[in-house]
From Swiss-Prot:
This is Phosphatidylglycerol--prolipoprotein diacylglyceryl transferase. Belongs to the Lgt family. The gene is lgt. The chain crosses the membrane at residues 10-30, 56-76, 92-112, 120-140, 171-191, 199-219, 233-253. One of its GO terms (molecular function) is phosphatidylglycerol-prolipoprotein diacylglyceryl transferase activity. It is found in: Cell inner membrane. Catalyzes the transfer of the diacylglyceryl group from phosphatidylglycerol to the sulfhydryl group of the N-terminal cysteine of a prolipoprotein, the first step in the formation of mature lipoproteins.
Length: 266
């Protein structure tokens, strides 16, 4: 059994002002995505400036935060937030939905593309390899917050979490960090080293994320207010991942078929 590192969720306190690690992880994710995007920007569009890139990252970040929070409210805990609406603004306590964040990003990208003459999938393909940076940082934030831990286990790397009872559990946040953060980043980085059909990068992203998340849900404790939805093992996260996997496969098939049907330059 490993020892859980006792990390204060508050990274810095200045009088009444408290800066939480969870919020800092989002800033790290957004900053890391911007740095990587600035390296890839000229390959994407030589006419782009740092100002336009910053504009895109800003709106995508808004989509992540607003969509992620509203998605959690709608998908996971609607009754509690209806009863206590002010809880919606307490984001430092956790409670973000990746699937809601993805919908928020899609809306932001569609709007940005309309303004700047880029297609939806051109922008999504550019953004997709950047997302694992934020996903990985967010999972570290979950770990520090001692939330979203896994089921009771006797594996050698199990941990006793401060608010998870006396028994050791799977550190499922670290599994998600390794898969959604590190592995997904490497897969997309290698895949985009050479030109790919439009929408194929987006398709690979949602396919891999859906698979990784579906698998980890088997060892992660479901949200207490929902529990298992069916068969004693199906979680809301898995339900939301099924359409992602199907959409990812469909996007990749469509992208490559569309590319093959286009006339090639002599």
């Amino acid at each position: 059994m490993l020892t859980y590192p006792q990390i204060d969720p508050v990274a810095l306190a200045i009088g009444p002002l408290k800066i939480h690690w969870y919020g800092l992880m989002y800033l790290i994710g957004i900053g890391g995505a911007w740095l990587l995007a600035s390296r890839r920007m000229k390959r994407f569009d030589p006419s782009w400036t740092k100002e336009r890139l910053s504009d895109l990252v800003f709106w995508v970040a808004c989509g992540v935060i607003l969509g992620g929070r509203l998605g959690y409210v709608l998908f996971y805990n609607l009754d509690e937030y209806i009863a206590n609406p002010t809880l919606i603004f307490e984001v430092w306590k956790g409670g973000m939905s990746f699937h809601g964040g993805l919908l928020g990003v899609m809306l932001a990208v569609w709007w940005f593309g309309k303004r700047h003459g880029k297609s939806f999938f051109q922008l999504m393909d550019f953004i997709a390899p950047l997302v694992p940076i934020g996903l990985g940082a967010g999972r570290i934030g979950n770990f520090i917050n001692s939330e979203l831990w896994g089921k009771v286990s006797d594996v050698p790397w199990a941990m006793v979490f401060p608010n998870g009872g006396p028994l050791p559990r799977h550190p499922s946040q670290l599994y998600q960090f390794a898969l959604e953060g590190v592995a997904l980043f490497v897969i997309l980085w290698l895949f985009t080293r050479k030109p790919r059909p439009t929408a194929s990068v987006s398709g690979l992203f949602v396919l891999c994320y859906g698979i990784f998340r579906f698998v980890v849900e088997f060892v992660r404790v479901p949200d207490a207010q929902l529990g298992y939805l069916a068969w004693g093992w199906l979680t809301m996260g898995q339900v939301l991942c099924v359409p992602m996997v199907l959409a990812g496969i469909a996007l990749m098939v469509w992208a490559y078929r569309r590319d093959a049907a286009q006339p090639k330059a002599a």
